[in-house]
């Protein structure tokens, strides 16, 4: 196994951890927003729910990207749509960061998901280049 494939596998394993963390934090925001609803104004309430939805999407896409990355690290011909999903994770993670200035913890986790997805996309391209040699 080459260094690029090992790095793709390590990044994919880290993505699984951050996908679970992002999903847990998004579910905490979902559970907490009805309790805060009486104390907060409507735009803040809606932004918190929108952010929780975006972070849930990021979590599921990150998990899918991680599974594709692990399979692709073991067998590079199985990378499939990993690059496309990694770009989608990066875009969704950045969107979640933009829409959630109030919820700092969730923004940080989504930003780390986006950074890991960009790094996984870079190593995806390197592993694909190894196949073509």
Q: What function would you assign to each model-found segment?
A:
Residues 88-109:
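Membrane-helix boundary connector in multi-pass membrane proteins
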Residues 61-89:
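Loop-to-transmembrane helix junctions at the membrane interface
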Residues 1-31, 43-46, 127-133:
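Cytosolic juxtamembrane helix and N-cap/initiation of the first transmembrane helix
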Residues 57-64, 112-120:
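Hydrophobic cores of alpha-helical transmembrane segments in multi-pass inner/ER membrane proteins
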Residues 20-23, 94, 118:
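Hydrophobic residues within the alpha-helical transmembrane core of Major Facilitator Superfamily
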Residues 39-61:
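A loop-to-helix transmembrane entry motif
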């Amino acid at each position: 196994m080459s260094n690029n494939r090992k790095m793709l596998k390590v990044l994919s394993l880290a993505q699984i951890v951050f996908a679970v963390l992002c999903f847990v934090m998004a579910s905490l925001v979902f559970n907490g927003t009805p309790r805060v609803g009486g104390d907060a104004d409507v735009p803040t309430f809606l932004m918190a729910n929108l952010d929780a939805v975006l972070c849930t999407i990021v979590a599921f896409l990150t998990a899918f990207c991680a599974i594709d990355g692990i399979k692709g690290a073991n067998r590079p011909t199985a990378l499939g749509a990993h690059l496309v999903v990694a770009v989608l994770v990066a875009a969704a993670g950045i969107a979640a960061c933009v829409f959630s200035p109030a919820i700092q913890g969730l923004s940080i986790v989504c930003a780390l998901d986006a950074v890991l997805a960009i790094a996984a996309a870079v190593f995806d391209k390197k592993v694909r280049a190894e196949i073509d040699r």
